Amino acid sequence: MPLVAESLKDGHFSQIAIEDGEVVGWLWGRPLFEGIWAWELRWLIVDQTRPRAGVGRALTESFEAWCQQRNILTIWLMTGEEMGETSLRGADLWADPFTPLATIQPVANSPFAFWQKMGYRFIGVIPDANGKGVPEYLMGKTLATLP
């Protein structure tokens, strides 16, 4: 509940998806770096009984449209490796980070793959963030249209 309360602060984006009178998804976005150019997509949660039903896509697209209306240039997010979502699970990213990072492959239907389908790019990693050999990934998307 503290996260939900924080998501409702002025200047944050918080949206739920409702189907048949039940909450089936929630997205929270928040400003970072003074909220002028870059926002964090902090949480996207979708009811596990409705996988691949378009709830996550709809919430994400709504957040992106909201950001575009406010001339926000970048949306970024973190996604974890707790469930073996990529080929880097168990890799020692401290020894030689660039070789494995250059060949990262998502596991089908993983959050990493979902974000790639939504147009988010892999832009960074925190090795061992969730335990030895279990990294956290930084992904981002530009909303800018260059002249």
Residue ranges of model-derived segments:
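Alpha-helical elements of Rossmann-like donor-binding domains used by nucleotide-donor carbohydrate transfer enzymes
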Residues: 2-3, 58, 62, 110, ...
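C-terminal "cap" of GNAT-fold acetyltransferases
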Residues: 97-147
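Conserved acetyl-CoA-binding loop-helix of GNAT-fold acetyltransferases
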Residues: 46, 52-65, 76, 91
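Conserved beta-strand in the GNAT
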Residues: 16, 22-31, 40, 45
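Conserved GNAT acetyl-CoA-binding A-motif
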Residues: 67-107
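Short coil/loop residues immediately preceding or within conserved phosphate-binding loops
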Residues: 11-12, 24, 36, 41, ...
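Conserved acetyl-CoA binding element of GNAT-fold acetyltransferases
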Residues: 37-48, 76-80
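Active-site rim helix/loop that mediates acceptor-substrate recognition in acyltransferases
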Residues: 1-19, 28
